[in-house]
Amino acid sequence: MADTPDLTQTPPTIYDVARMAGVSIASVSRVLNGRRNPREETRERVLQAVAELGFVPDGAARALSGRLKEVVGVVIRRVRWTTTSDGGFAEEDESLQFTDVLNRGIELAAQRRGFNLLVSSVDADDHDASRRLLALARKSDGLILHDRVLEPDQLDELARRVPIVTLANVATRTTTNVHSDNTSGMQALAVHLLADHGYRSIGYLAGLADSPDSLARRETLAAEAAVAGAVLMAGPEWQGNYYATGGARVIEQLLADGTTLPRAIACANDQTALGVMYALAQHGIDVPGDVAVAGFDDIPMARHLRPQLTTVRQPIQEIGTCAFDVLHSMIGGGAPAARDVLLPTRLVIRASCGCPTISPPRRLP
């Protein structure tokens, strides 16, 4: 990480001036460039912020302040790995259906506002991520980050350059986080599996090791398993990566090691569950007769699996729409109503958990 740029040394930007003065970027532009006659109160606030920050507008800054780029950068975290096992898993390069639906929500909201998207991806082990995001920030009016691609302190420093909305349940001092309610969603799923079905052992097949969402779901499941007196299997050998091949790889390795599988498996997301169900079928293990399986997300594919997948529905497209709307407000100089925007989840009961029929989504209390 020695080549990571030191964002703390970057000069103040027009975004900093607008944020400190509590006005829009356009208002800062009018004051600095003498366009129209801004209100005296606005002029004084802008000039005071300029003085306190030591902001010196150069040609590029004036160009930026005079006209927004009308571009938002969207950053996705990708996972790439290989394995030499006889199972034949290839290099990871799957498309997450969750990401596709989420990006559609961002895109629809952006189109309504006349904005375009710059979509970029970084690998999970990309040590140059901060430099790449810095370059993307220069081309954008704001950033939406799907996953945890920077450490919180780096994220705060980058947010001094452009407004940032995160979708990875990462709380910082200067960014706004839009995400779904992991706790209530996993609670509802755990109660259904452990209390309604009475399963006495349950595994949790995790997402990425540093994913706040995956960790939150695991903690909730662990708490509910303790209350129910059920055995939870969630050690390092249950570490996935949010992809179907990651879920299949874990099951293949557990079976190769002679591990007795739990009665139910809750997965960090639906694509992991897809891989789990595929691997179980390859070994003649019946779902849900031998092992019940559940996911989290309710991606389109969940209802087309056989058996159909019991899962927790996130309002995926709405998360994207909400994220852009919040970011657009921040780009205009407004302060977000909240630094943490929480959207509700629903338990969707289908057949993979052992229920005989499909039920409509059950709204959580």
Regions found by a protein language model. Give the residues of each.
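Bacterial carbohydrate/catabolite-sensing allosteric modules
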Residues: 1-7, 20, 51-52, 86, ...
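N-terminal helix-turn-helix DNA-binding module of bacterial transcription factors
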Residues: 1-71, 75, 357-365
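Short beta->alpha connector loops
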Residues: 55, 122-126, 146-151, 271
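Amphipathic helical "hinge" segments at domain boundaries
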Residues: 56-131
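Structural motif
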Residues: 75, 144-146, 266
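Short acidic active-site motifs
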Residues: 128-132, 153-154, 246, 250
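Short acidic/histidine-rich motifs immediately flanking catalytic phosphotransfer sites
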Residues: 136-142, 259-263
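Acidic, Gly/Pro-rich loop/turn segments at junctions of secondary structure
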Residues: 144-154, 169-175
